[in-house]
Amino acid sequence: YRNMIGSLLYLACWTRPDIAFAVSELSRFVSSPAEQHMIAAKHLLRYLQGTKDLGLKYSQPKSLSPLDASNVLWGFVDSDWAGCPDTRRSTSGYVLMLNGAAISWKSKRQSVVALSTTEAEFVAASSLVQEVIYARRLLSNLGFPQTKPTAVFEDNTTCIKWAEGAVGGTD
């Protein structure tokens, strides 16, 4: 089971972001897997077999000019709230895109217990923003400075207002 999860983690990290959440959940049971965890892991392997033609596909942008609009970063972020029945911790997920392709993604259990959906979403959004800062610096060092703000797509309106500094308190 441990070797299987290690291989699945490799795939989730490098070529198959679509399995990141499932692998994250399965990896919680590496130290003491039950039969149901092995069944779920094998189900994930069958999914991979059936979708082996899927994966990240990168294409060259129309222009390699740093001023080209296609060289703009954008990200999507979401979170559940208290999704873990044992710890009541939430799970964050994000994907950072460049030229229509995912360049960074993560699905991870939050280290804090959020007291509201807004707080869980804000923790998730802050993780994405940290990754955006890193990616913008990296792209700038590679000669592709980001001249426009990075759009972050978030579905919780109170979280968006918090990020804009328009609200204090929780929902």
List where the protein language model places each region:
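Divalent metal-binding acidic/histidine catalytic loops
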Residues: 1-171
